[in-house]
Amino acid sequence: MSNIYDLANELSRNLRELPEYKAVAESKKAVDADSEAKAIFTDYLAFQQELQQLAQTGQVPTQEVQDKMTSFGEKIQGNAVLSEFFNKQQQLSIYLADIERIIFDPVQDLLK
């Protein structure tokens, strides 16, 4: 029987070969090459951290935070490079969700 870690590493390598993964990687290069897109993306990642901290502490987002979410959504949709990046990322996430379901299926069986 194969070592479970070897299988996980093989899965990681195979994910990197998916056309959807490569499309996200190329799209990320385009974000990095566009100063406006990169600035918005960097700010967005920092904001995501703030949201995670709120969620971890059980705090409800204030109206100010909600307004900031809306603003980021508008900025991202208004920037073709970022919009494309997030669309490509969404396509890849379909694979990741399927893989997660498959991997955690045995754990779910234990809870039945």
From Swiss-Prot:
InterPro entries listed in its UniProt record: Com_YlbF, YheA/YmcA-like_dom_sf
Matches recorded under SUPFAM superfamilies: YheA/YmcA-like
Family from the record: Belongs to the UPF0342 family.
Name of the protein described by the UniProt record: UPF0342 protein SSA_1465
Source organism (scientific name): Streptococcus sanguinis (strain SK36)
Lineage summary: Bacteria, Bacillati, Bacillota, Bacilli, Lactobacillales
